[in-house]
Amino acid sequence: MARSLKKGPFADPHLLKKIEAQVDSEKKSVIKTWSRRSTIFPSFIGFTIAVYDGRKHVPVYVQEDMVGHKLGEFVPTRTFKGHKNDDKKTGK
């Protein structure tokens, strides 16, 4: 289900504050965040945001085609290890 248009996109205020601080200081360092639910705004383009996947922070470089998506879409939380091998041996 999509978010209501009258509500607008969501981004955590602390994340917006960190982006604005880096724009003002003209320094680009990795921004750590736990906010996977934040929508990527056009002002995020060119920044590297380390998004938490439940175990570690994974760096995501924000590009133009990511605008409008959520940060969590680009960092999977589960690692697929493969299915169990069934060793069906005949003979005793």
From Swiss-Prot:
Gene3D superfamilies for the chain: 30s Ribosomal Protein S19, Chain A
Q: Gene Ontology cellular component?
A: cytoplasm; small ribosomal subunit
Query: What's one GO MF term for it?
Result: structural constituent of ribosome
Q: Keyword rRNA-binding, does the record have it?
A: yes
Q: Which UniProt keywords apply?
A: Ribonucleoprotein, Ribosomal protein, RNA-binding, rRNA-binding
Q: Name one GO biological process term.
A: translation
| Family listed | Belongs to the universal ribosomal protein uS19 family.
Q: What is this protein's function per UniProt?
A: Protein S19 forms a complex with S13 that binds strongly to the 16S ribosomal RNA.
Q: Which PANTHER family match?
A: RIBOSOMAL PROTEIN S19P FAMILY MEMBER (PTHR11880), SMALL RIBOSOMAL SUBUNIT PROTEIN US19M (PTHR11880:SF8)
* NCBIfam families associated with the record: rpsS_bact (TIGR01050)
Q: What name appears for this protein in its UniProt entry?
A: Small ribosomal subunit protein uS19
Q: Tell me which species this is from.
A: Leuconostoc mesenteroides subsp. mesenteroides (strain ATCC 8293 / DSM 20343 / BCRC 11652 / CCM 1803 / JCM 6124 / NCDO 523 / NBRC 100496 / NCIMB 8023 / NCTC 12954 / NRRL B-1118 / 37Y)
